[in-house]
Amino acid sequence: MKWITRKNIRVNRAATCWLIGRFLDPEAELIFLSPEEVASIQNETGGVGFDAPDAGYPHQNAQGLCSFAALVHERLAHDPVLVEMARIVQAADIQGQLDNHPAARGLQLISGGFPLVTGDDHETVARSAFVYDALYASIKNNQAR
């Protein structure tokens, strides 16, 4: 399936790409466009748009959730590690929520550097997967204690 989002990914979009690849659609085709193109390409291709105006999963949905958190709550709420990750990504990505989780500032700071050390969004997805894999493993380890 095609998953379409805004280019120059950082916090929420990088995390959502990781979520798609690891849990939702390992064969996904990720497409990065300008914000105004996302919804029309979503509609033309039958894909799923996220973190863009009029996308299936907008930057913030009616409940105030970012696309990562919305996808977790809708499709993966049975995984307590992903639920906790959703809290972190939500706090790091949505303006005014940074103090809602102690890990949010760190994730925001790290994610802000993604486009500074990669050549394009596909490289960001590949290289940032380590961050989200490590975050998942750390939360899982902490929850097992």
Enumerate the language-model features and the residues they cover.
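Extended, well-folded catalytic/binding cores that form a central cleft or groove in large enzyme
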Residues: 1-8, 17-18, 22-145
